[in-house]
Amino acid sequence: MTEQTGKRMMRIETDRLIITDFTMDMAQAVHENSLDEDNRRFVPDEVFETLEEARETIEFLISVYGTNDGPQVHPVITRQDGKNIGYVQMVPMEDGTWEIGYHIAKAYTGNGYATEAVESFLPEMAGRVGISEVYGICLKENIASVHVLKKCGFEPVFEGTGDYQGEKRKIFRSVRKI
C-alpha cells in the first residue's frame, strides 16, 4: 500500500523486466514510445502527440489504480538499465469481460519483452480484478501481436471483420483461461 493512495502498488519482477505503477516523471518516455510507426498503425488511440497529452493520460491512469473502473495500465521497465520500453494493460470491455493489451517501443521489439510482460502480468491482474479468463484482440495484420497472444496460450475464437477502435477491420480475437 502506498501512504498517498492507500492502494496496493504493482511490482512484478522477471529476469529482465519490472512492471510497476506509472509516476508523473515517466511522461517523456510515454510520449516518445507512443510515436513509433507501429503504434500509429495498430493502436492510433494510444499515440500522444504532445508531452502534455502523455502527462494527462498518466494522471488519469494513476487515478484508476486499485479500481475496476478503467484501464489498468502499467509501464514495462528494463531491469538492466531502467528504461521505460512500453506498457502492459488490462482493460474492461462493455460486456463485462477484460482485454489484455501491450506495446513495446520499436527499438526494443523482437526480444521477447511483450511475451515476458504478458506472462507475468496476467495472473497478477486477473487476481486483482477477479477474473478467470481474458481476451486478446488485435488487427489480424499485426503479426507480432498475434504471435505474442498465441505464445502466451491464447486460443483463437474469431478471425474476420469486426469492430476495432470504431472501424470495421480484420481482427484476431482470442481468449485465455487463467
Q: Where are the regions that the model predicts?
A:
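Acyl-donor (CoA/ACP) binding surface of acyl/acetyltransferases
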Residues: 1-41, 75-178
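A short hydrophobic/aromatic micro-motif that marks alpha-helical segments and, especially, helix-coil
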Residues: 22, 50-52, 65, 168
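Conserved GNAT-fold acetyl-CoA-binding loop/helix
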Residues: 38-60, 72
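Generic macromolecular interface patches on structured domains
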Residues: 40, 49, 64-68, 159-160
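A short helix-loop-beta-strand connector motif used in the catalytic cores of GNAT acetyltransferases and
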Residues: 61-75
